[in-house]
UniProtKB/Swiss-Prot annotation:
Record protein name field: Histidinol-phosphate aminotransferase 1
Family per record: Belongs to the class-II pyridoxal-phosphate-dependent aminotransferase family. Histidinol-phosphate aminotransferase subfamily.
PROSITE patterns: AA_TRANSFER_CLASS_2
Top EC category: transferase
Gene for this chain: hisC1
Source taxonomy: Bacteria, Pseudomonadati, Pseudomonadota, Betaproteobacteria, Burkholderiales
SUPFAM superfamilies: PLP-dependent transferases
Organism: Cupriavidus pinatubonensis (strain JMP 134 / LMG 1197)
Coiled-coil segments on the chain, per record: none
Catalysed reactions, as listed in the record: L-histidinol phosphate + 2-oxoglutarate = 3-(imidazol-4-yl)-2-oxopropyl phosphate + L-glutamate
Required co-factors: pyridoxal 5'-phosphate
Pfam families linked to this entry: Aminotran_1_2
Keyword Amino-acid biosynthesis (UniProt): yes
C-alpha cells in the first residue's frame, strides 16, 4: 500500500519526471481500425508506420522459419553471427557494434549510459518522439532547437550545447519531416562538438537515400570517438515486427551500452532474419526503387491538389492538409473511415499535417483517392 502523506493523501509512485511523460502512441494497427469503423481488414491500407510495403525479404523468411526450431533455447546474447556479418559489411571490428531491440533500444541505451539526471540533451524541433522520451525518462533536461525549413539547424544546435550537455540526437533523414542534412554540413557540425558530448546519428532511413546523398558515417566513427551511428532493420530491410537495430561506435561507447543492455535483448529469430536480410542486396535495391516511384506518385498528387509538402529523403512524405489546427485530426478520421491509415503529427507540434508512408502503387492510389474525398 502506498505511504500516506501528512494530509492523508497517497504519496505518488515514481519520480515527477517519469509521471510527466506522455506515453508513446504508435500508429493504429489494421485490426483496431477494422473494429472501430466496422471495416474488412483485407481492404484496409496502412501507410502510418514507415514499414516496407514489400514486407520481409524471402531470404529472411526462410532464415526466421529455420530459427524457430531453436526457440527453446536462449538467443546468443552477443549476437556473434549478426555482428560478424555487420563487421564484414561495414569494415569495423565486432566490438564496435551493439545490437538493440530495434534502434529505439539503442537510442534509449545511449541516454541511460551517458547522461545523468539534470544534465542536458540537445535535439531538434520536429524530430523523432523517442528523443524526448529518452530524455524525460532519465530526468535529463531537454534543449529543443528550433527547426529550419522543417529540419535540423546544425549551427543553432552547436550553439545550444552547454557545459552540462552530454548527448545530441540527429536523425538523417529526419522523422517525421523527411529532411536531409548533406555530409559536408554534418562533418562541420561534428568538428564543433566538444569531446565530452556524444552525437547519436540516427540513420533509420539511411538505405532510402539517393545515390548523390550517400555518405560514409562509419568512416566518421573512426575519426570521432564521440560519434555513435544508429541503424535499424525495421525500415528498408522489412523486419519491423522482429525489432532489431544496431549501433556503430568506438569501443569506449559500445562497452557502456553493452554494460546496461538486457542480456538477451535481441531474440534468435530476429538475429537470423537480420543476417539473411543484410546479404539480400537485390531486395534492398528493389525496395529503394519502389520507394522512389511511390514518392513521385505522392508528390505529383499533392502538387495537383495544391497541398504543401516537405521534400523527403525517407520512405514517407509529410503533407499539410489544411489551415486550421484541427485539419490533421479531421482529415485523419475521414481517411480512417475509408480504411486508410496514415499518421497524424499533432504530437510533434504539427496539427495541420499528416505523415504518409510510401506504399505499393495501388496503396498509394487508394490513399490519394481517399484524400481527395476527405478534402472536399
Amino acid at each position: 500500500m502506498a505511504e500516506q502523506g501528512k494530509q492523508g493523501g497517497k504519496v505518488p509512485f515514481g519520480p515527477d519526471y517519469v509521471r510527466a511523460i506522455s506515453p508513446y502512441i504508435a500508429g493504429k494497427p489494421i485490426s483496431e481500425v477494422a473494429r472501430e469503423f466496422g471495416l474488412d481488414e483485407a481492404g484496409i491500407v496502412k501507410l502510418a508506420s514507415n514499414e516496407n510495403p514489400l514486407g520481409m525479404p524471402e531470404s529472411a523468411k526462410h532464415a526466421a522459419a529455420a530459427a524457430i526450431a531453436e526457440l527453446g533455447r536462449y538467443p546468443d546474447s552477443n549476437g556473434f553471427e549478426l555482428k560478424a556479418a555487420l563487421s564484414t559489411k561495414l569494415g569495423v571490428p565486432q566490438d564496435w557494434l551493439t545490437l538493440g531491440n530495434g534502434s529505439n533500444d539503442i537510442l534509449e541505451l545511449a541516454a541511460h549510459a551517458l547522461v545523468t539526471p539534470g544534465q542536458s540533451i540537445v535535439y531538434a524541433e520536429y524530430s523523432f518522439a523517442v528523443y524526448a522520451l529518452a530524455t524525460q525518462e532519465i530526468g535529463a533536461r531537454a534543449i529543443v532547437v528550433k527547426a529550419r525549413d522543417y529540419g535540423h539547424d546544425l549551427d543553432a544546435m552547436a550553439a545550444a550545447i552547454t557545459s552540462d550537455t552530454r548527448l545530441v540526437f540527429i536523425a538523417n533523414p529526419n522523422n517525421p519531416t523527411g529532411t536531409f542534412v548533406p555530409a559536408a554540413a554534418l562533418e562541420t557540425f561534428l568538428a564543433k562538438v566538444p569531446a565530452e558530448v556524444v552525437v547519436v546519428l540516427d540513420e533509420a532511413y539511411n538505405e532510402y537515400l539517393d545515390d548523390d546523398q550517400q555518405y560514409d558515417s562509419v568512416a566518421w566513427v573512426r575519426r570521432y570517438p564521440n560519434l555513435l551511428v544508429s541503424r535499424t532493420f525495421s525500415k528498408a530491410y522489412g523486419l519491423a515486427g522482429l525489432r532489431i537495430g544496431y549501433a556503430v561506435a568506438q569501443p569506449e561507447l559500445t562497452d557502456l551500452l553493452n554494460r546496461i543492455r538486457q542480456p538477451f535483448n535481441v531474440n534468435s529469430v530476429a538475429q537470423a532474419a537480420a543476417v539473411a536480410a543484410l546479404g539480400d542486396t537485390a531486395f534492398l535495391q528493389r525496395s529503394a526503387e519502389l520507394n522512389r516511384a511511390g514518392k513521385a506518385q505522392l508528390v505529383e498528387a499533392f502538387s495537383r491538389l495544391g497541398l504543401e509538402f516537405v521534400a523527403s529523403s525517407g520512405n514517407f512524405v509529410l503533407v499539410r492538409v489544411g489551415d486550421d489546427d484541427d485539419a490533421g485530426a479531421r482529415v485523419n478520421v475521414a481517411l480512417l473511415r475509408q480504411g486508410v491509415i496514415v499518421r497524424p503529427v499533432g504530437n510533434y507540434g504539427m496539427p495541420r499535417w499528416l505523415r504518409v508512408t510510401i506504399g505499393l502503387p495501388d496503396e498509394n492510389a487508394a490513399f490519394i483517392a481517399a484524400l481527395e474525398r476527405a478534402l472536399k
